[in-house]
């Protein structure tokens, strides 16, 4: 999954809502007090796997976007603060919320004066127009293009106004403007399918100075960001840390040791060790944090090829046959709740319909549905090669064997797995995925991950390749609504998709968990941003 695909548990613990890492941090009363803070220092973050891209037009992994939360400047943002204020969409580069005209279809943003890129150039409306240009450029294949498919036109007006006109009213448009795809970029940023490389010029409080693929990354201060001056001061960033260093490659068990020995500051750990860490350090005190997040993990079935294409009964059989209890256990202590629905428990609009078994496999129902529908009985499953990936794949292999399907497991680095499954025509039948919200709206799960009209050649997040015309129309209707009617429509749509079409099999709505060194202070987390890099400090 891209932001938001979630990384595997061992991949990173910094992401929020891009493809998902299942072990993120949480914060609560009892965390390290801000009075323990000191400005400066280096924060070392360990990850089993690398960023997908460092180009905001292409990146969509949770931990990549978490890094970009400290480096990018968007028109609007969700404040880097815990509690209700962190879920309230607010102006960032914009002077205020945009002026709305043309029956709710035209938005005019006025850009604050004073923001500068890390190379010293001024941020203007043209920098946001360039971000739109790149997201919509077909040669780039940006995942951001699908979030602009209802844009009729966009333009700059003078130096500091940016205007967007939609084809139809879209209640979630402003929330989309908080996404990293649409952050300010220099007007000469090239169109390249491979993405730009470090150093990445950006207009947030930090910028990416170095990126050594599969090895390390370095993020340092933007010298032109002045916390105590406007327009910067109103955003409330602390920016305590001088530089962030990412260390890529160590396995989860090694990461834990690195944090315990003071060789790193934010680390993952084997899922089986979560209980031990909680017992040793307590929960939400200083070093081991647990927090609810809007993240879902699920088993994807490829609806475009092989044994699951036009085979809804076999897809339903899989949802009955998998062992959600065992799968959730592989995520470890306090990992989350079992689920059989696509909207996470904490997503507005969620309603519990109890469609499939949350206890163990229902082989009787699964076999009835599978009978006569297994075709050649062969399936290829992709998974990642760390943490919960291998044991969950083996569980699926065993469960599906009981209904007449032989599963061949192929393991990859998480980034490679995602690149493969996101390529249309890739020869897989099953893949293990996780997704976290970009913004708190049910369309960010259902429309983003299941609207088949958004499928492109590569960089897909709809890796089930589900494309149902009737469901697409219902998504459009739900997305045109607002308020309680919108949430009710999406709740029923969730039920009907899972009950009647079963393009994938959800199994856990997760918590965030994170382990830190004893020198980390001011730790904060939100379900939108993930770990708050602009607020964290060293003690």
Question: What is each residue range found by the language model?
Answer:
Residues 206-207, 336-371, 386-391:
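Structural transition elements
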Residues 514-539:
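Long beta-strand-rich cores associated with HINT superfamily self-processing modules
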Residues 46-102, 133, 201:
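N-terminal lobe/hinge region of extracytoplasmic solute-binding protein
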Residues 79-84, 178-243:
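Gly/Pro-rich hinge or "lid" segments in bacterial periplasmic/extracellular proteins
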Residues 55, 308-348, 391-392, 497-506:
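Periplasmic-binding protein-like
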Residues 38, 110, 144-189, 194, ...:
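Surface-exposed binding/hinge segments that line
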């Amino acid at each position: 999954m891209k932001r938001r695909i979630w990384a595997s548990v061992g991949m990173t613990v910094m992401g929020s809502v891009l493809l998902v890492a299942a072990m993120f941090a949480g914060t609560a009363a009892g965390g390290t007090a801000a009075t323990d803070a000191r400005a400066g220092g280096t924060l070392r973050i360990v990850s089993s796997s690398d960023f997908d891209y460092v180009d905001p037009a292409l990146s969509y992994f949770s931990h990549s976007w978490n890094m970009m939360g400290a480096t990018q400047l968007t028109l609007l943002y969700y404040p880097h603060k815990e509690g209700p204020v962190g879920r309230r969409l607010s102006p960032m580069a914009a002077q205020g919320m945009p002026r709305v005209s043309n029956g709710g279809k035209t938005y005019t943003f006025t850009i604050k004066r004073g923001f500068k890129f890390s190379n010293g150039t001024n941020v203007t409306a043209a920098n946001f127009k360039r971000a739109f240009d790149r997201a919509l450029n077909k040669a780039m294949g940006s995942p951001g293009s699908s979030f602009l498919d209802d844009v009729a036109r966009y333009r700059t007006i003078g130096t500091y106004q940016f205007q967007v006109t939609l084809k139809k009213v879209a209640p979630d448009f402003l929330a989309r403007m908080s996404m990293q795809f649409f952050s300010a970029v220099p007007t000469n940023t090239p169109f390249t399918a491979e993405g730009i490389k470090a150093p990445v010029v950006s207009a947030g409080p930090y910028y990416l100075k170095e990126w050594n693929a599969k090895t390390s990354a370095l993020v340092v201060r933007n010298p032109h960001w002045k916390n105590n001056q406007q327009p910067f001061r109103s955003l409330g960033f602390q920016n305590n840390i001088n530089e962030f260093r990412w260390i890529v490659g160590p396995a989860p068990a090694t990461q834990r040791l690195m944090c315990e020995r003071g060789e790193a500051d934010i680390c993952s750990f084997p899922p089986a060790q979560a209980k031990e860490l909680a017992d040793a350090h307590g929960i939400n005190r200083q070093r081991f944090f647990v927090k609810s997040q809007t993240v879902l993990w699920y088993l994807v079935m490829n609806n475009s090829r092989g044994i699951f294409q036009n085979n809804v009964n076999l897809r339903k059989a899989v949802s009955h046959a998998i062992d959600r209890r065992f799968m959730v256990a592989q995520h470890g202590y306090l990992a989350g709740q079992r689920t059989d629905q696509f909207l996470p428990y904490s997503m507005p609009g969620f309603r519990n319909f109890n469609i499939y078994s949350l206890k163990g496999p229902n082989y009787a129902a699964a076999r009835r549905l599978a009978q006569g529908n297994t075709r050649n009985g062969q399936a290829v499953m992709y998974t990642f090669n760390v943490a919960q990936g291998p044991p969950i794949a083996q569980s699926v292999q065993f469960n599906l064997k009981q209904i007449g399907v032989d599963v061949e497991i192929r393991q990859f680095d998480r980034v490679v797995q995602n690149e493969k499954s996101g390529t249309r025509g890739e020869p897989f039948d099953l893949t293990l995925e996780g997704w976290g919200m970009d913004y708190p709206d049910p369309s960010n799960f259902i429309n983003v991950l299941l609207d088949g009209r958004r499928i492109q050649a590569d960089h897909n997040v709809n890796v089930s390749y589900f494309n149902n015309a009737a469901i697409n129309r219902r998504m459009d209707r739900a997305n045109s609504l607002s308020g309680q009617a919108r949430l009710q429509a999406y709740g029923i749509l969730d039920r009907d998709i899972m009950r009647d079409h079963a393009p994938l099999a959800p199994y856990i709505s997760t918590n965030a968990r994170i382990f830190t060194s004893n020198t980390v202070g001011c730790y904060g987390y939100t379900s939108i941003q993930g770990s708050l890099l602009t607020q964290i400090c060293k003690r």
